[in-house]
Amino acid sequence: MYTFPEKGLSEDMVTDLLKEMRSRDCPYDRLLSTMCTRPHPVAVRAYSMFLETNLGDPGLFPGTAEIERRVVGILGSLLGCSDATGYVSTGGTESNIQAVRAARNSSGRRDGNIVVPRSAHFSFDKIADLLNLEVRKAELDESLRVDVGDVERLIDDRTVCLVGIAGTTEFGQVDPIGDLSELAIENGIPLHVDAAFGGFVLPFLEKDCMWDFRAEGVQSITIDPHKMGMSPIPAGGLIFRSSDPLRRLETETYYLTVSRQASLTGTRSGAAAAATYAVIMHLGIDGYRKVVRRCMDMTEHLVSEARAMGIEPVIEPVMNVVALRVDDPPGVRRALLERGWHVSMTREPKALRLILMPHMTDENLDLFLSDLEDVLISLRRGG
């Protein structure tokens, strides 16, 4: 049982308490299951500079508000829209909620449905509950991209939004956004792209594909700086092609320095926007290309070494997400955890899921591969 202390502790004692609890957390150098990573040092410094700021009341913090406008503009241009609108959110879940809410509000319906891929993030299940919308899940094709024909089958006159994924959580796959865009335009339905992970990967890959605002039917995109953008948690981005959907989210804020507010949360730390701006300005396109290239090099190395062990990926990796076909994925996962490695699993098909993030080193990856081989040999022998 925890109670409010009668008398406070010294700062040193509080620090010791925090250090002890922090020591129980998993070190990033053993994490292959997370889509988050250590924030860049320049982002950490920027975050600490803006701890006191509140973007929920931007008139009090005009400099911080300008930073957010710049971040939205920069992310919009990265995603193929030079006059985008939006805001810095807490992450992908909030951005997805707000994107669908904007689409629902634009439709004028309160009894609608949305069509998402079966591979969609669980935030869309939360959306069903929060917004009282039916979530229809379209099947995937053999490459684990959404089946556009099934999406078309699920659309009716109550459909308020279509969703495509650019970097699925389990497999890192990219849906055929161009085809979904055409479907959205034909039916007069907005298309939202969840690029929470892929948003800071796809623009920096050598191979380009149509997944962003270049597809005319795309109304909104979720992109998370606190993933491959290397900004501290929580830092998300909700980017709209135009201002109208954002206005559909506004509510009156009579006691603040602005009369209306579109964000889901009221009080919003400006630190996330500042940190995101700092790391973007520091790394630039060239810096992010190097970060992504290194992650893809590790991805290719992992797949090559896995194949040498007789293990194939479920799909050829599109980005730095790998799903390996192993016998008894739960058993392999447990055995790796006993050796200090944190990996996860996919659902269908069941496989070992690995994310090669910037915090992983070549040396630790080779240690992991050695342990993986030992685990597989042991399990095959029944050990």
From Swiss-Prot:
Transmembrane segments: none annotated. GO terms for molecular function: aspartate 1-decarboxylase activity; pyridoxal phosphate binding; tyrosine decarboxylase activity. The modification N6-(pyridoxal phosphate)lysine is found at K227. GO terms for biological process: carboxylic acid metabolic process; coenzyme A biosynthetic process; methanofuran biosynthetic process. Its EC number is 4.1.1.11, 4.1.1.25. The keyword Cell membrane does not apply. Keywords: Decarboxylase, Lyase, Pyridoxal phosphate. The keyword Lyase applies. It catalyses: L-tyrosine + H(+) = tyramine + CO2; L-aspartate + H(+) = beta-alanine + CO2. It is an enzyme of class 4 (lyase). Its cofactor is pyridoxal 5'-phosphate. Pathway: Cofactor biosynthesis; methanofuran biosynthesis; Cofactor biosynthesis; coenzyme A biosynthesis. Belongs to the group II decarboxylase family. MfnA subfamily. Catalyzes the decarboxylation of L-tyrosine to produce tyramine for methanofuran biosynthesis. Can also catalyze the decarboxylation of L-aspartate to produce beta-alanine for coenzyme A (CoA) biosynthesis. This is Probable L-tyrosine/L-aspartate decarboxylase. It comes from Methanothrix thermoacetophila (strain DSM 6194 / JCM 14653 / NBRC 101360 / PT). The gene is mfnA.
